[in-house]
Amino acid sequence: MTTHDAHHTSGHDHGPAVRHEHGYALRDDESVWDARYSELDRVWSGEPNLALTVEAATLAPGRALDVGCGEGADAVWLATRGWEVTALDPSGVALARARAAAESVRVSVRWVHAGLAEADLPVGGFDLVSVFYPALDLETGPVGRLASLVAPGGTLLFVHHAEVDRERALEHGFDPDLLLSPEGMAAGLGDGWSVTGPEKRPRSVSGGAGAHHHDDLVVRAVRTTDT
């Protein structure tokens, strides 16, 4: 997940998983993610992701979607800077913490208790779609789903860890080959997009479950057409 919250519906590191007939893949299973978040009073650092703060600083505030918002640090940060924020996560435990974080600084966020695949979201409804450290099963068609949510002229920001230890990943119950990667995100967009990356960038994390990851792979894609 992240300097802040792990996106996993995509969300910010990886945790619980389930076996598919073809191997391993994470899914938007509320009970699994609730168990993950219930292990600790706070899983992530509570700070927004560095790549988000850098990229959002170049954009005029508009409508933002935080996919796999976890405990809400990115969503709250965007809201404090004038964005109209929708944030989704399959974990009710995580969303309760996210709501509390928003209330503590008196900002409004629309919280959606769902994973990406089943969430009711407007096509072309967002000027920024932010996806950090996701665990998106390729079988669910995540590239097309994410792309469909971005408004013309809008930005899709997809960030993942640069270092993936495959053996460790398999031990923790997921197969990176079955999940959307930065390379897959960039390659899958096709015409109608101006794509930068994946670009390797250092990250600095003060604490939380993602602190052992030191570099990000960042994909920034701007939708150049309305088709």
Give the residues covered by each predicted segment.
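Conserved SAM/SAH-binding beta-strand->alpha-helix loop
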Residues: 91-93
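A short acidic, Gly/Pro-enriched loop at the edge of an enzyme's catalytic core
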Residues: 121-128
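Conserved class I S-adenosyl-L-methionine
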Residues: 2-59, 62-70
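A short glycine-rich, Lys/Arg-flanked "PGG" loop and its adjoining helix->strand segment in the class I
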Residues: 141-152
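Conserved beta-strand signature within the Rossmann-like core of class I S-adenosyl-L-methionine
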Residues: 153-161
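Conserved SAM-binding loop
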Residues: 98-99
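Conserved SAM-binding strand-loop segment of SAM-dependent methyltransferases
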Residues: 105-116
